UniProtKB/Swiss-Prot annotation:
This is Guanine deaminase. Belongs to the metallo-dependent hydrolases superfamily. ATZ/TRZ family. Strongly inhibited by p-chloromercuribenzoate (PCMB). Potassium cyanide (KCN) strongly inhibits activity towards 7,8-dihydropterin but has almost no effect on activity towards guanine. Pterin inhibits activity towards guanine but has little effect on activity towards 7,8-dihydropterin. The keyword Ligase does not apply.
Amino acid sequence: MATVFLGTVVHTKSFSEFESFEGGFLAVDDAGKIIGVGQDYHAWASSNPAHAKGLTEVHLSDYQFLMPGFVDCHIHAPQFAQLGLGLDMPLLDWLNTYTFPLEAKFSNHQYAQQVYQGVVEATLRCGTTLASYFATNHLESTLTLAREAVRQGQRALIGKVCSNCNSPEFYVETAEESVSATLAFVEGVRKLGSPMVMPTITPRFALSCSKELLKSLGDIAKRFDLHIQSHISENLEEIEMVKGIFKTSYAGAYDEAGLLTNKTVLAHGVHLEDDEVALLKVRGCSVAHCPTSNTMLSSGLCDVQRLVSGGVSVGLGTDVSGGNSVSIQDVLLRALDVSKHLDFFKKQNIRGTGVSKTQDFNYHQLKYKQALYLATLGGAKALSLDHLTGNFALGKDFDALLVDVSVVDKPLRRLSVDELVEKFIYTGSDRNIVEVFVAGKRIKQGYQ
């Protein structure tokens, strides 16, 4: 239904540019495309009578605003089943003790259906209109995830995980099996016939794939012009193992396989070296910043400002279940926290060991509007889908959240636009996200 929303509208246009319209409007056509946005609805309607005719008006309250939907650039869908568990050990131990045994269960179709229905429901409830999902090694259950995203109306990139080495015997495949299943998955997703759900090539991480498998996956991505997702430089032990096996840097291992493209998003990037950052920029790759899991699994503090200034696109990832929440809003807060912690290290030298090479008195903390960019347009750009979604530019799909800051505790006074956004970011939850839209279709209505 063609609709015009009348009230406060906010979005970002770049990492440093936040735009808002108090008492503004946003118009959406029957196809779910944004056809008008700005301050003066009546002036727009007068100059666009054909578009304005027949629009249903929706009036927002003083405590409501429209914003773009959240983008989760990195989430492990099967690990939703162990959310909040096993976060007392570092990455490699956590994988072997908790995660690999869990993911092996997804050979059971009924179990996979139950979990995947739950994770799509939960992420949509929290305002995630676009997610980049890792599934498991299993072809059929990964197709189940794709079908579930289509059924519930979520925009998604979905990958069948590939791993043929350095994995437990009960959860490993041969390179031939991995390539065959990946090709079958790509074809299976395309047969679903939905432009909302797309396949993405997914080597789990460099350690879990042989050089031959990585190269084969790079070839498939090139042949079909596919998205690519994996992990990079999350944990110091992991990095040293990669260097020992591949005799190059972590980024170099992927680059030699043809896996670094302008459709590649790599999770974490906590310990990237300067030449790796430069390589990612040249290749047009992006990083999914996962501050929650980087903290939970004791991986480190990722310097987002360094990546952005180095020309690398950055989005946010929940990294469920290394991260303990499916909410990108929660991750947004954690990103701000990590930036403050880095500020402590760089300016206050709290290590107590004299001048540290990490010291930087010119470091600038992330601001909440910059973090909002990372959670929306930055994420869409990181996933190479910013031509479709991420903000309210004309012609894009209407992927949006209707936020109401008065749902739980009504403010004692009227708030400015900036205050509305800031209050939601710092004190809000999924309860404040009263409506969710994907491609113009209402997915959630009312507090659930």
